[in-house]
Amino acid sequence: MSVFKGEVTSLPPDKSISHRAALIASLSDGETEIMNFSAGFDNQSTLGVLQACGIPVRQEEVPGPWGTAILRVVIKSKGLWSLTPPSAPLQCNNSGSTMRMFSGILAGQPFQSELVGDASLLKRPMRRIADPLIQMGAGVSLSPIGTAPVVITGSKDLHAIDYRLPVASAQVKSLVAFAGLHAEGETRIYEPLSSRNHTELMLGLEPRVENEERVIVVPGRRQREARPFQIPADPSAACFIVSLGLLARGSEIMIRDVCLNPTRAAFLDILIRAGAAVTIENRRTVGGESIGDILVEGTRDMEPLVISDPQEVAIAIDELPMLGVLSAFATERFELMNAGELRTKESDRIEALALNLERLGFVCHQEPGGLSVTGRKGRPSGPVVVECFDDHRIAMSFAVASKACGEDIELSDREVAGVSFPNFFSLLDALEV
C-alpha cells in the first residue's frame, strides 16, 4: 500500500470564488486584477462568456508566493450595463455555475442571449433559475423539460423582489443578487438554510436576521468600483488530498492556504468528529475569507461517517462523493440522508456512488435523498471500470481510493478531472513516496 507525504502549495484556486470574482469584475467600474484565478475548465467557461459579451479579459502566468506559477486575470468594465449582445449562443461547456449565475447578469442587460452547454449540462435542471428572474421582469425560456438551452430576454427595467429560496442554493442566491444589482429598489433574499456565502462577502452585503430567517438585502443600481481579488486554495479540492492522507496509513500531508470559510469547510468538521487526524494551523483572514493550513495524518482509525443534518449537507454538498468513498473504504460503512440535491449535480451522484461502490464489492442501499453502505462482500478479483458519468468529482473520488488503497480501478474518463483540478493526477504522483 502506498504512503503519501509532502507539502501541497499547488492546490487549485477556489473554483467558486474565481467564478464570482470574474462576474463581479464585469459589473464594476474600472480594471479588476484577480490573482491566483482558477485555470480549470469551468472557470475558463466563465471568462469565455464574458469575452463573448464584449468584456475585455487578459490572462497571464506570474510567479506565486510559493515559487509556483499562478494565473493573473485582468478584467475591464464600465459597470453594470457594460455587456454587449453576443453574436452566437454563449457556451458554458460543463459549468452549471457559469450558466446559472451569469443568467442573473444577463437578465439586467437590454438584449436577448442564449446559454448552452455540453451534453451533461444540457440534462441539468434549470427551472429554479427562471422563476425569480421572470418575477423581476426578465424573459426566460427553457426546454420543454426545464433544462438548457436557456434563453434570456434581458431588461434595463428590472424591479426588486422579495424572494425565498426553495432550497439551499448558492448559485440561485447569487443569480438573484446579480439581477438585484440591476433592479430598481432593494431585492431581499430569504435563505431557509445557509449556503456558501462568497457572493455576499465579495459584494459587501451584510446578512440580517428577521423573524429567525437569514435575509440578504441587495441595493439596486449602485455603481461599484473595481477592486482586486486574491483567490485562496479550493477546499473542495483539498478534500481529495485530505482523504488520500487518511486512507493511506503512515501518510502525512500539509496543505497550504486553503479557504476555510465556515460555509465551505464543513467536511473538516465531519472528519474531525469521526476521529480523523486532521488539524487546522495558521488560520487567518485574507480579503474577507478565512484561510489556513490543513495537516492530515494517516495515523489512526476513524468512525464511519454519518451525515444527516440538512444544514451540514447543504454546505458540504460538493465534498459528499469523496466523503462517501472515504468512509466506505476506511470503515465499510457510510450513511447519508437529506441529500436529494446530489441527484441534480453533474451526474446523479447518489446513483453514481452506489453503482461504482457495488462494482467494487460494497453493499449499498439507495433512498431518494440518501445512500447507505453496510459492508463489503470482498474485493473483486480483477480490474473494475468505474463509470465517471462525465463528473469530475466522481472520477477523482474513486481515483483517490485506487491510489491510496491499491484498488485495481480503471476510470472511464480521467480527463474530466480537469474541470476543477487540472493537476490532480500529477499531484497524487508527486506526493507518493
From Swiss-Prot:
Pathway the protein takes part in: Metabolic intermediate biosynthesis; chorismate biosynthesis; chorismate from D-erythrose 4-phosphate and phosphoenolpyruvate: step 6/7
Residue sites binding phosphoenolpyruvate per the record: K15, G96, R124, Q171, R349, R393
Swiss-Prot/TrEMBL keywords: Amino-acid biosynthesis, Aromatic amino acid biosynthesis, Cytoplasm, Transferase
Main location: cytoplasm
Active site: D318 (proton acceptor)
Record InterPro entries: Enolpyruvate_Tfrase_dom (IPR001986), Enolpyruvate_Tfrase_sf (IPR036968), EPSP_synthase (IPR006264), EPSP_synthase_CS (IPR023193), RNA3'P_cycl/enolpyr_Trfase_a/b (IPR013792)
Subcellular locations according to the entry: Cytoplasm
Cellular component GO terms, alphabetical: cytoplasm
EC number(s) from the headed UniProt entry: 2.5.1.19
UniProt protein name: 3-phosphoshikimate 1-carboxyvinyltransferase
Lineage: Bacteria, Pseudomonadati, Chlorobiota, Chlorobiia, Chlorobiales
Gene symbol of the encoding locus: aroA
